[in-house]
Amino acid sequence: MAAVDPSVSGVSGRYATALFELAREDKSIDAVKADLDKFDAMLAESPELVRLVRSPVFSADTQSKALAAVLSKAGIGGTTANFLKVLAANRRLFAVADVIRAFRALVAKFKGEATAEVTVAEKLNDKNLDALKAALKSVTGKDITLNVKVDPSIIGGLVVKLGSRMVDTSLRTKLNSIKHAMKEAG
């Protein structure tokens, strides 16, 4: 059994740990992660799928049958499909986003990687993403996986969260600091 990661706890952590152990035994960690990433992307694109996953109105049987059809059409099979069907049968499908996040954390720890949450005002090009990864790798000594979120409200710059550290170089924060300083001065 893997050592428990403090960032992986609760119901979602237990399910993620069980899936991780199963994938490790089968030597299918990368395949399971790819399938979970695909399912996560499907959730991001489909409000109907989100409703199926989160709504308590659907019975476990209805969720399982609908999920089986969705997974089949998406080409998600094997360990991942069976695991998601178990979540549905156990009425835990609502926690799938947290399970995916916890599974990613376990995979990153297993591979000696670190994950950085990056918020930007506009989508970064590949050159800038590579430069950011290299800069973060030089600080941590680990390979970096970036989870990039676009949030126009930060106006410019970026916000990087890596473990317990956060660096906020957003224009919004700088403008708020200036505004606060002007209020104190005047």
From Swiss-Prot:
Q: Which GO terms describe its molecular function?
A: proton-transporting ATP synthase activity, rotational mechanism
Disulfide pattern? none
Keyword vocabulary terms for this entry = ATP synthesis, Cell inner membrane, Cell membrane, CF(1), Hydrogen ion transport, Ion transport, Membrane, Transport
Q: What is its main location?
A: membrane
Signal peptide extent: none
A GO CC annotation recorded here is: proton-transporting ATP synthase complex
Compartments it resides in: Cell inner membrane
Transmembrane intervals:
none
Its membrane topology: Peripheral membrane protein
The family this protein is said to belong to:
Belongs to the ATPase delta chain family.
Function comment: F(1)F(0) ATP synthase produces ATP from ADP in the presence of a proton or sodium gradient. F-type ATPases consist of two structural domains, F(1) containing the extramembraneous catalytic core and F(0) containing the membrane proton channel, linked together by a central stalk and a peripheral stalk. During catalysis, ATP synthesis in the catalytic domain of F(1) is coupled via a rotary mechanism of the central stalk subunits to proton translocation. This protein is part of the stalk that links CF(0) to CF(1). It either transmits conformational changes from CF(0) to CF(1) or is implicated in proton conduction.
> What PANTHER family does this protein's entry cite?
ATP SYNTHASE DELTA CHAIN
> Subunit notes for this chain?
F-type ATPases have 2 components, F(1) - the catalytic core - and F(0) - the membrane proton channel. F(1) has five subunits: alpha(3), beta(3), gamma(1), delta(1), epsilon(1). F(0) has three main subunits: a(1), b(2) and c(10-14). The alpha and beta chains form an alternating ring which encloses part of the gamma chain. F(1) is attached to F(0) by a central stalk formed by the gamma and epsilon chains, while a peripheral stalk is formed by the delta and b chains.
Protein name (record)? ATP synthase subunit delta
**Which organism is this protein's natural source?**
Nitrobacter winogradskyi (strain ATCC 25391 / DSM 10237 / CIP 104748 / NCIMB 11846 / Nb-255)
Gene encoding the protein = atpH
